[in-house]
UniProtKB/Swiss-Prot annotation:
Alphabetized GO MF terms: rRNA binding; structural constituent of ribosome
One GO-annotated biological process of the protein: translation
Coiled-coil zones: none
Family per record: Belongs to the universal ribosomal protein uL24 family.
Assigned GO CC terms: ribonucleoprotein complex; ribosome
HAMAP family, sorted: Ribosomal_uL24_B
Identification of the protein by name: Large ribosomal subunit protein uL24
NCBIfam families: rplX_bact
Species the sequence originates in: Acidothermus cellulolyticus (strain ATCC 43068 / DSM 8971 / 11B)
Amino acid sequence: MAGLKVRKGDTVQVIAGKDRGTKGKVIAAFPREQKLLVEGVNRVRRHTKVTATTRGSKTGGIITKEAPIHVSNVMVVCPECEKPTRLGRRQDVVDASTGKTRPVRICKRCGKEI
């Protein structure tokens, strides 16, 4: 199974599901499950039991937090053209004398490095 093309810190737009059209920043990526945690997307309510903390305060109640969303339901938003795009890969030369290269992600729409 290949790794994810989307990384933590990328801005993505949801293309399918109840939050379709919403843009958000990737908080965490789970490559093994092919899922992402996106800020402000797929918010769910969790009922947590009231428990005492070490300082004596009590925590619990209804908490709203983000749930993971499948990577196929999002597209990366290019920072240059501000539109959802597919990603490509290109080898950029780091050192011409030694021929060292590094892979970079590029926007298929405008061709700029992401």
